Amino acid sequence: MAHWQDTVDVDGVRERDFAVEVDGRTVPGVLWLPASGPGPRPLVLLGHGATRHKRTDYLVALGRRLASDYGFAVAAIDAPGHGDRRVPGHVDDVALFGDFLTEWSREGTVDDTVADWHAAIEAVRDLEEVGDGPIGYWGLSMGTIYGVPLVAVEPRIQVAVFGLMGLLGPTRDRLAADAPSIACPVLFIQQWDDSLIPRAEVFELFEALGSLDKRLHAHPGEHAAVPVEEIAFSARFLARHLAPHAGET
């Protein structure tokens, strides 16, 4: 079941909050749409990183860019323990990161989040202004932890952007098992000096991806220092595969 809020027009991009109910969980989300026009249109799913949420600045900027420049529908949801699903009173990054580590270790966290995404996909595609167009996925760091298993089992996803993650931690075996099933084009973004995710584990995950159309872009700097130019490139990469002529003038 989906619950929709009123549409708000912000500088020519329509924005609408929603929530889906999944096995007793309430999963909040946000949808961005171009100013006008019916579907079907491509849909891009945005997965946020640990301690962040569906309205983190870089996600909002990317969602609005994909909606305004390419005419896409764009959806983001709060992962377990994040955003509107965080533990009451936990607002600082230290507490939120501790909550993430607990959730990352929880059996069933991946399956639950994949189910959350499936419910969000169905709710969004039921809208006349979205419809049954092709789907892309974009998610770095924790967005890759949950994104790889989703893309592996969702045949409607035709292109993916991953990064800032490797084969490590509690979900190492799950990602190693799911990555070979991914056949769509993939852009993988990595920070060369990332002190959180060692390069060797990054290369392991990249190599495990089953896609024959994949590329790894590396940049100097720490985990969160992805250049804005790379984010812009990732938007063009999604557009090239979802709607080759979108954004042309």
Predicted regions and their residues:
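The serine-hydrolase catalytic nucleophile loop
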Residues: T51-G63, A79
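Acidic catalytic loop of the alpha/beta-hydrolase fold
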Residues: W192-I197, A224-A225
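Short beta-strand/loop motif that positions the catalytic acidic residue
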Residues: I182, F188-Q190
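C-terminal catalytic histidine-bearing segment of alpha/beta-hydrolase fold enzymes
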Residues: S211-T249
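Primarily recognizes the serine-hydrolase "nucleophile elbow" in alpha/beta-hydrolase
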Residues: A115-S181
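Alpha/beta-hydrolase active-site loop
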Residues: D92-E128
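N-terminal cap/lid segment of alpha/beta-hydrolase-fold proteins
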Residues: M1-G39
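Short beta-strand element of the alpha/beta-hydrolase
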Residues: G39-G49
